[in-house]
Regions:
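Active-site-proximal beta-strand/loop segments in catalytic clefts of secreted hydrolases
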Residues: 1-3, 30-33
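Short N-terminal secondary-structure initiator segments
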Residues: 1-7, 121
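Conserved alpha/beta-hydrolase "acid-adjacent" motif
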Residues: 5-12, 38
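Conserved loop-alpha-helix segment in the C-terminal half of the alpha/beta-hydrolase fold
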Residues: 12-22
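Alpha/beta-hydrolase-fold serine-hydrolase catalytic core, especially in secreted/extracellular enzymes
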Residues: 22-23, 31-36, 41-128
């Protein structure tokens, strides 16, 4: 997430992303999330202490939502770039910010592909 207090965001994962040279360089960011948003679900052993459990939960994001978003984006990426299914490439957002905005005409901007209307708030998708 963009509030990663372990690896850092601006001078950590974002900086690494910006320095990558791959042709298909993408990064999905959960806004206001810290470092501990994965893997999910938390293993049973982690419930023994609060310290261990803290590695698997984030105060801003529900793990079910995180899993669904990651599954959606991962499948779109793999289908597009590994399987060569170009129709699935359309599910990789073209617009960086997931937030939909209401215009002067009271109509909202389109949601990201594969997301219901007004359902993808708090995500950013970086392309390089």
């Amino acid at each position: 997430g963009d509030q990663d207090n372990t690896s850092g965001f601006k001078n950590g994962v974002k900086k690494l992303h910006d320095q990558m040279g791959s042709e298909h360089n993408y990064m999905l960011v959960f806004e206001d999330a810290r470092h501990n948003i994965g893997p999910h679900p938390a293993p049973a052993a982690s419930f023994a202490t609060d310290f261990e459990l803290g590695h698997y939960f984030d105060p801003s994001w529900d793990s079910e939502t995180i899993n669904r978003v990651i599954e959606h984006m991962s499948l779109a990426f793999l289908d597009c770039h590994v399987k060569g299914d170009t129709a699935r490439c359309d599910y990789l957002p073209k617009r960086q910010d997931s937030q939909q905005y209401e215009g002067a005409d009271h109509k909202y901007t389109d949601p990201w592909p594969g997301f219901p209307h007004l359902w993808a708030s708090g995500l950013k998708f970086y392309r390089k």
